[in-house]
Amino acid sequence: ETYQACKEESVLSVIDGAHGVGQIPLNLGDLSPDFFVSNCHKWLYTPRGCALLYVPKRNQHLLRTSFPTSHGYTSPADRGRGTHAGKTDFEMLFEFVATVDDTPYMCVPAALDFRKRICGGEDAIYKYLHTIAQEGGDVVAQIVGTDVMQEPGLSNPFQESDIRRCAMVNVRMPLAFKDDKEVNPHVPDPSSSPFSLLSMKDAKPVCEWMQSRLIMEYDTFAKFYPHGGWLWLRLSGQIYLEIEDFEWIGNIARILCERVGSGEWLQKSRI
C-alpha cells in the first residue's frame, strides 16, 4: 500500500524485502517496484552474504556507481554509448566490484535445485514455513500465557491476518513496561502483567540478558524486543523445525521471563 501510494504521487521508493526471497511468493514483474532489495542467505539457503538488487530498466540510469566504486564505473560523458561489447552501463556497473567474494552468488543455482529436488519446490516450502510458524507461534503463546501479534477482531487469524502471512511470528511475553509512551490499545494493559513492571530504560539490558542466556545456556538465539508496552519474542519457521521445537523455545521463554521477574537480570556479572 505504501509503495502504491508513492507510485500514485510519482515518488520513487525502495522496497526493503530483506526477508522476502525464499519466504514468500514474489513476482517483481507484476509488482514493478522502482527498486527492490532482498537477501538470498536469509531464506533461499545460500551462504552469507548474498543479496540481490532489482532495478527495472526505466530506473537503471539513476544508479551512478556501485559501492565501492569499481572497475565497471562509466563516467557520465560515456554513458549510453554502447561501448561494453553489448552490455549495458548497468550490467557493467555490477559485473565486477572490487574484492567482493562472488562465491555465495555462485551457490544460488545449487540452492534452487535443493529447494526443488529435496524440499518439494517453492509452493511446498512456503506452505510449510507459514504453517509451522503460525502453529508454533500459537503454541508458544499458550505456554507463556499471552497472544500472538496480529490485527484485532479476526475470527480466523491463520487465514485472515496479513501480519501473520509469512514464516515469522511475534509472540507477546508476560513482561511489560510501565512507561512506554507507545502503548498499543489492541493488547492487554501493561498493568495486567503477572510480574513487576519494568522501566523502558531497562528494555535494552533486559533483552540483551535474555538473549545472552539463550546463547550461553541453551545454545540457541531468538530476538526479544519491546513494543507497545510489552516485551515480544520474534520466531521463525523453517523446513527443519517441528512443533516440538516451538514447545521447547516456549518453555525456555517462560523460564527466562520468570527469571527476569525475579530480578536475576540485574546481576550483571551473569551476562
Describe every region a protein language model picked out.
Residues 1-271:
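Pyridoxal 5′-phosphate
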